[in-house]
Structure formats: structure tokens, C-alpha cells
């Protein structure tokens, strides 16, 4: 029974981590509460925090008008696209307030599962990441980032706090931890990580990337803005050719300059991918579209014609069919 339960947790965790990201948006995270006020944080499309605030629109203070002004000012100042509301205490009340505030704007709102956000806010990792923020501000950031890139944010939290199952504390903790850790690695290897939203915790799971390299990638992104292509990684401090070769197939870019940068196809196989597409009458522009028909291919024959290994071809086709977790 225990093994079965661990299996169920692993499956639930995998589903949570594979949830679709919401890329390219500016998001306002809203951590709802009553007495202590609602904490707000605005993040840009790379997850960088632009501003935080605290408002009291709920009971007992009911400062709805003042709160509305703060929220509308933030929306205007940063061109906010979406508000992510945590689903904890005062979530329903917050939802009503938000719906009312944004009714004359093009902003949308989404309720986000905030399980584990408070555990993260009080963690050593959050202290390192946001030394100057209080726990409420950290929670609001975490809620916004969960909507933007669930995988990047959830890997910061002990899987047992994300609420993936009941009675997990009665189990063999070593087995449970190994199983859940394995899930994260598998997801990272299967779908890759978005180079422009990945947290340092997530980058640590990528082959070849150490803790310090992960921090350097984040610093580079904060200073220079989004990565436009994978090759830019070579500009990151202490990230040499060898590390690039190890990690390049697992880091992806949304809306990249080179369409293959949004797949887990390794740059070393780009020529092979282009040759294959060309042979089948497609171009790079067809990637991810419905035009691309890649079923029932004769891999042996293609392998001979293109001088590319069968396994490499199969991997390329698998990726061309599904760039990432959309």
C-alpha cells in the first residue's frame, strides 16, 4: 500500500510540475488575507520583481477605494496583463474585489493554488532570494511566479508541502523523497526549462549547471533582460563550452530568434533537424504548427539518405511534434 501511495504522489507531483506556463506576461501576484492585509507583487515576463505593496480591502478594514487606486496605479505603471490570486484565506473576497477593480480594463485574473507558498516564504532559500522582503511580499511573488512558470517556482518547495497527497508524513520518508526528487529530474529532462523564467533552484536540476552557474545565469538575465538565443549562454560568467554542451539541450527559449531554441533538440543536432525538415518539404517556420505531419516515417530509409542515426532522428521528430509543455 505504501509503494502504491508513493506512486500516486509522484504522479500528482508530475502533473503539477507539467502545468502550462504563462509566458511573456506581466503579472500581479495577490496574496489574500483579512486582518494582515493583502500583499501584492508585480513581476515582469522574466519573473523579476518590479514593485510590492500592501492593501486592506477586506474585513475588518474594508479600505476598498484606497486599495482600488493602488491596484489600478500598478496596472497602469507596469502594464499588468494578469492578476494571480492565491486560493488561501480571503481568496473568495479578494476575487470579488479584483473582478470589480478590473471590470473596465483588459486585465484578467486567475486563481492560483498557493499550497506551500507560506512554507517557501519562511525558508532559507527565500531569505537568500529576497533578503529585504517580509514573508507576505515573498508569498505574493511566489503566487505570481507560479502562474508564470509552475515548474520554476514549485521546485523551490519541498514536494511534501505542495499538497500532492494525504498522509504523506506516515510514509518511508527516504523512499518518498527519492521518488519525488526523481520526478523533478524526469520532468526537467523531458520538457526542458525556460531560460527566461527558470529560477536558480530549477537550473540546478539541469545537467552541467552548478549552484554558482545558476546564480550567474540569473544575474546575467537581470542585468541584460531576456535571452534571445541559447548561444547567449556563453556570455554568462564562468559558463564555458563544456557546460554549454551539457546543458544546451535542456534550456529553452520562448519565441526565440531560432525556432529550434524552443525545443529540447541539442544545438549539435540543428543541422540534422533542418536537413530532415527540408527532406520532408517543411521549413523551420512549420515547427509547432499543425502543418507538420511526422507520423509513419521510415526511419531506416531516412537515416541512410540523410546520414543521421536512427535514434537521433527519432529524438528530433519527437521534439518537433511537441515543443515543450504548452
Regions found by a protein language model. Give the residues of each.
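Extended, highly charged clamp/arch subdomains and adjacent linkers
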Residues: 1-26, 45, 68-72
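Conserved phosphate/pyrophosphate-binding and hydrolysis machinery centered on Walker-type P-loop NTPases
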Residues: 2-7, 30-33, 84, 88-91, ...
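Conserved, well-folded catalytic cores of nucleic-acid-processing
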Residues: 16-20, 46, 74-81, 86, ...
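Gly/Thr-rich phosphate-binding beta-strand-loop-beta motif of the actin/hexokinase/Hsp70
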Residues: 21-49, 147
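A glycine-rich phosphate-binding loop feature that marks nucleotide/adenosyl-phosphate handling sites
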Residues: 30-34, 88-93, 112-119, 160-173, ...
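Short glycine-rich, Thr/Ser-proximal phosphate-binding strand/loop in the N-terminal lobe
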Residues: 42-62
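Conserved phosphate-handling catalytic cores of large alpha/beta enzymes
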Residues: 63-84, 89-192
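Accessory alpha-helical DNA-binding modules that contact the DNA backbone or grooves
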Residues: 190-326
Amino acid at each position: 500500500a505504501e509503494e502504491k501511495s508513493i506512486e500516486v504522489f509522484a504522479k500528482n507531483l508530475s502533473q503539477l510540475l507539467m502545468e502550462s506556463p504563462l509566458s511573456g506576461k506581466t503579472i500581479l501576484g495577490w496574496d489574500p488575507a483579512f486582518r494582515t492585509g493583502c500583499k501584492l507583487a508585480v513581476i515582469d515576463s522574466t519573473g523579476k520583481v518590479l514593485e510590492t505593496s500592501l492593501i486592506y480591502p477586506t474585513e475588518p478594514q474594508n479600505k476598498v477605494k484606497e486599495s482600488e487606486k493602488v491596484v489600478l496605479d500598478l496596472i497602469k505603471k507596469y502594464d499588468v496583463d494578469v492578476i494571480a490570486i492565491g486560493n488561501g484565506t480571503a481568496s473568495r473576497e479578494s476575487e470579488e474585489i479584483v473582478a470589480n477593480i478590473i471590470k473596465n480594463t483588459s486585465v484578467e485574473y486567475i486563481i492560483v493554488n498557493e499550497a506551500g507558498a507560506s512554507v517557501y516564504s519562511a525558508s532559507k532559500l527565500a531569505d537568500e532570494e529576497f533578503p529585504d522582503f517580509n514573508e507576505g511580499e515573498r508569498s505574493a511573488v511566489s503566487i505570481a511566479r507560479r502562474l508564470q512558470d509552475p515548474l520554476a517556482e514549485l521546485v523551490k518547495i519541498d514536494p511534501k508541502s505542495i499538497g500532492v497527497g494525504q498522509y504523506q508524513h506516515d510514509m518511508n520518508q527516504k523512499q518518498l523523497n527519492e521518488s519525488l526528487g526523481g520526478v523533478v529530474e524526469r520532468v526537467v529532462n523531458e520538457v526542458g526549462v525556460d531560460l527566461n523564467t527558470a529560477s536558480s533552484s530549477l537550473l540546478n536540476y539541469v545537467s552541467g549547471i552548478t549552484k554558482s552557474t545558476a546564480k550567474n545565469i540569473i544575474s546575467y538575465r537581470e542585468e541584460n533582460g531576456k535571452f534571445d538565443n541559447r548561444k547567449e549562454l556563453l556570455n554568462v560568467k564562468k559558463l564555458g563550452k563544456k557546460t554549454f554542451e551539457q546543458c544546451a539541450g535542456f534550456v529553452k527559449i520562448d519565441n526565440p530568434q531560432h525556432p529550434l531554441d524552443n525545443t529540447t533538440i541539442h544545438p549539435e543536432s540543428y543541422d540534422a533537424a533542418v536537413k530532415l525538415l527540408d527532406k520532408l518539404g517543411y521549413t523551420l517556420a512549420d515547427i509547432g504548427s499543425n502543418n507538420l505531419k511526422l507520423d509513419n516515417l521510415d526511419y531506416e530509409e531516412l537515416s541512410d539518405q540523410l546520414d543521421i542515426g536512427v535514434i537521433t532522428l527519432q529524438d528530433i521528430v519527437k521534439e518537433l511534434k511537441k515543443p515543450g509543455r504548452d
